[in-house]
C-alpha cells in the first residue's frame, strides 16, 4: 500500500522521536531504576555482597531503626543531617537571598560579582573539600593564621578536630560552595517582579527591611519553593564534603557523622570496620529514599500554597 507524503513525514517524525527518547530511557532504566529496585530487594536479605544470603524479612529495617548497635549511630547521624538542613537554610539560602538583593540593585561591577558568586558552585566538591580542609588546618590554615595576625590567638583551634566546631566547619564549607546557586535563582525571581511594585513601595515610605520582608520575599516564593526542596534533598544526601574533610568515621567521636557516611560504612565497610553488609545498607538507603520522597513532597506542597501570583 503506497504511503502518502504526509504519512511518510509523520513516520519519519515518530522514528526521530524514538531515536531521541529510547536511549535515555534505556540508560535511566539500567543505571537508575534497576539499582533502586535492586536496593529495595536486597534490603530484605542478609547479603554480604558476594552471594545473596537468606531472606530475613524486616530484620534489617528493625536493626537500622531500633537495633542496639545500629540505631544509635543512625539517629545520631540523622540529627546531624537535620542540623545541617536548618543551618544551610539560614546561611546558604538566606545568604543567597541577600546576595541576590545586592546584585539586583546593580552595584558597580555587578556583572563581575555575579560571575564571582557563582564560580564556587561549578568547582568540584572534592576540590572544595580539600581546599577548606587546608583553610581549617590548625597549623598553617588561613583561618587560624588570620586570627593570629589580629591578636585573637585564643580563638584559634583545630576546627575539624574539635567536636564543638567540626560540624559547623563542614556546614560553612558547604554554604560557601553552593551559596551562588540560590543567589542566582533568587536574582532571577527578583528580576521578574514588576518595577512598579518596588517603586510604589518606596514612594509609600517603605524602608529597605520592610521592602525585603513584606514585598520581595513573598513575591520570590516560587524560587524559595525550588531552593528549599533541593536543599532538603541535598541535606539528607550529604556525603562528599564530610567524606573529604573528616573521613568515613564522622570524626571526631561521631560529631560529624551523617546518614551518607553511615550508609557507606555499612554497605562497603571502612578502615575500622571492614565487614560489608549490603542488606542492612540497602535497608538504610530505602528508608532514607522514602523519607526524602515523602517529606520533600509535603514541603513542596506546603510552600506552593504560600506562593503569591502576580
Feature names for model-found ranges:
Residues 1-11:
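Short, Lys/Arg-rich, polar N-terminal cytosolic tail immediately upstream
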Residues 10-310:
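A structural signal for multi-pass alpha-helical bundles of membrane permease subunits
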